[in-house]
Amino acid sequence: LKDREDYSFWPPYHISPMEKQDLLRNCLAEAQKYLSAADVVQKSSFVWKSLQSLPLMVRHYAMSPPEAIVSRPKGPKSFAVFEVEGHPCAQLLVGFEKTPDMEFCFFKDEQDGSWKLDWQQFARFQPMNWEDFVRGKGEDIAEFRVWMVRERMSENKDDYAFKLIAPGMNGSEERSIAPVS
């Protein structure tokens, strides 16, 4: 697996190569279980901080259909393990034959040590519509999760492009706010 994105700005989470392979298999299995779950309550059992996420999931999926596998997976395209704000994190990008890639982010559960899906990242959940907020509609102040991806543009070690990722449906390529260099 080759990472297209450079995660070096996050501190690495050190695990052995064998542990990383086991974690990759585990994350693939957890992603499959999440996508195959019959309803939101069942899906929440695979979600990090599920008690906080379940009400958000219910609200979100009342307006949007749950993600489903409608194309055959091609397998993992990238996999990285690092630390985010003191939490071990595994980021997995899975390619599909006829549909957009899906990105999964897993955090290690502090209670049982299992790796759980960061649902808010996966669903690109936001409490209000991002476009309305940017256009000045709705609340004057709102809190959003904003994703930033740093992509290596060439073999030159310092040649990067930064993209802020706007909230949107998982796998959508129309999430970029603006490239920043």
Task: Walk through the language-model features, giving the residues of each.
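Residue-level detector of functional hotspots within protein domains
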Residues: 78, 93, 130-134
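Hydrophobic residues embedded in beta-strands of well-ordered beta-sheets
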Residues: 88-90, 114-115
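Short solvent-exposed beta->alpha transition segments
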Residues: 6-25, 29-32, 36-87, 165-176
